[in-house]
Each structure stands twice: as C-alpha cells, then as structure tokens.
C-alpha cells in the first residue's frame, strides 16, 4: 500500500472512530451530522466525500465493523475454551467485556436493529445472522447434533444474550455481575433443553420402526 493509500485509510478510520465517539446513551447515529463527524476527525466537511458517499454509508460501515468485532472476540473466546474452561461462562464473560470496552458499537447494533432505515435494519440483521451461523457451526461440531437443532439453539442463545447486553449497557459493576450470572444460568438451561429435546426425538425415531404394523 502506497503512502497516499495509507493516508486515505487512516483518514477513513478517523471518521469511523469520530462517529463512534459521538454516540452515547442519549445520542443515536441518526442525530449525527456530517460536519460534526468531520470536525471530530480533523478534516474539512468536503473531504468527507472522498471516503464515504454520505453519512448513511459511514453508518453501514460502522454496523459491519461492530458485528465483525464481536464475532472476532467470540472466536477468540472459543479458542480459549479449547484450552480448558466453561464454554458458556467464558463466552458470557467475553461478551460482557465487549460491551464494557465498546458500548457505542453495541448501542449502534441495538438501535439500528429496529430503526427507521431499512438498509440499517437489514445490515444489523445480517450481522446477527452471521453471529447465529457461527455459533450454530460450533454447536454442531461440539455437540454432534443436526443443523436444525443447533440453529434453533443458537438463535435462542443470541436473542437472550442481546437482551442481557442491552440491560448491561448502563448498569454498575455489581449489577453487571448479577446479569452475567443470570445469563449463564439461562444459557445453560437452553443448552440442557436442546440436548434433552434432541435425545427425545432420537428415542421417538428409534421406537417408530418397531411399532410399524403389517397392513
């Protein structure tokens, strides 16, 4: 990459970080202006268009980055699990660390998931689906269950995790610890329930052939 390309990428990165820094519990992406973001990044407003077509393209890039960042962290968590440790507890701790270190990235995903922009809703839905698919892959590999079961389990887990994450955004350390414990319990219940249901379906299938009558 040449010097010019490096500088362009650096400025683009500054714009993304500037936009993230201006989000808060009180301020959504929709309230940001191009001028504010450009000023925070240290560039002229007109220079913004060298990097993004408009503010919406910047926002969609932020959604993609937020989802990717979370998925990469969860992959790292699964690598830690491979060396020993509780799957669910390690995953929950990693997720809560992500929220603590990147609250605005998670806020963006939460808000735009049900926001007014169809493009943003689709982008967030796509990121969540990636998250579900990766978790389903892992569950299928580890638990040796059919894809239909692991997808249903992964979707239930991600739904509960995102709900807990929304609660965790604006609470204190002790409340977050309690949330973590509750989330670990809920995910274990889903995991046990999925395994029980799978075994039940297997037993039903095994019984059926012996019960078939000659007609």
Curated annotation (Swiss-Prot):
InterPro entries hit by this protein: DesT_TetR_C (IPR054129), Homeodomain-like_sf (IPR009057), HTH_TetR (IPR001647), HTH_transcr_repressor_FabR (IPR050692), Tscrpt_reg_HTH_FabR (IPR023764)
Key words, A-Z: Cytoplasm, DNA-binding, Fatty acid biosynthesis, Fatty acid metabolism, Lipid biosynthesis, Lipid metabolism, Repressor, Transcription, Transcription regulation
HTH tetR-type domain mapped to chain residues: 10-70
Localization per record: Cytoplasm
An individual GO BP term: negative regulation of fatty acid biosynthetic process
Transmembrane segments: none
One GO term describing the cellular component: cytoplasm
Highest taxon of source: Bacteria
The entry's DNA-binding region: 33-52
Keyword Repressor: yes
Gene Ontology MF term list: DNA binding; DNA-binding transcription factor activity
Assembly and oligomerization: Homodimer.
Function: Represses the transcription of fabB, involved in unsaturated fatty acid (UFA) biosynthesis. By controlling UFA production, FabR directly influences the physical properties of the membrane bilayer.
UniProt-listed HAMAP family: HTH_type_FabR
PANTHER family noted in UniProt: HTH-TYPE TRANSCRIPTIONAL REPRESSOR FABR
Family annotation (NCBIfam families): PRK11202.1
Protein name: HTH-type transcriptional repressor FabR
UniProt source species: Shigella boydii serotype 18 (strain CDC 3083-94 / BS512)
Lineage of the species this protein comes from: Bacteria, Pseudomonadati, Pseudomonadota, Gammaproteobacteria, Enterobacterales
């Amino acid at each position: 990459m040449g010097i010019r390309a490096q500088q362009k990428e650096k400025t683009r990165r500054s714009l993304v970080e500037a936009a993230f820094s201006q989000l808060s519990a009180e301020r959504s992406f929709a309230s940001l202006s191009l001028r504010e973001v450009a000023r925070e990044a240290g560039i002229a407003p007109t220079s913004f268009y060298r990097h993004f077509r408009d503010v919406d393209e910047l926002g969609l890039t932020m959604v993609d980055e937020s989802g990717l960042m979370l998925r990469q962290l969860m992959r790292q968590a699964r690598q830690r699990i491979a060396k020993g440790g509780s799957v669910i507890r390690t995953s929950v701790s990693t997720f809560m660390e992500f929220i603590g270190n990147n609250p605005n990235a998670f806020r963006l995903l939460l808000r735009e998931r049900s926001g007014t922009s169809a493009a943003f809703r689709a982008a967030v839905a796509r990121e969540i689906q990636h998250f579900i698919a990766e978790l389903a892959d892992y569950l299928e590999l580890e638990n040796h269950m059919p894809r239909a079961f692991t997808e249903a389990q992964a979707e239930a887990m991600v739904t509960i995790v995102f709900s807990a994450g929304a609660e965790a955004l604006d609470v204190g350390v002790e409340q977050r610890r309690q949330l973590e414990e509750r989330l670990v319990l809920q995910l274990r219940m889903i995991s046990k329930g999925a395994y029980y249901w799978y075994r039940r379906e297997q037993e039903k299938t095994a019984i059926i052939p012996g019960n078939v009558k000659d007609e």
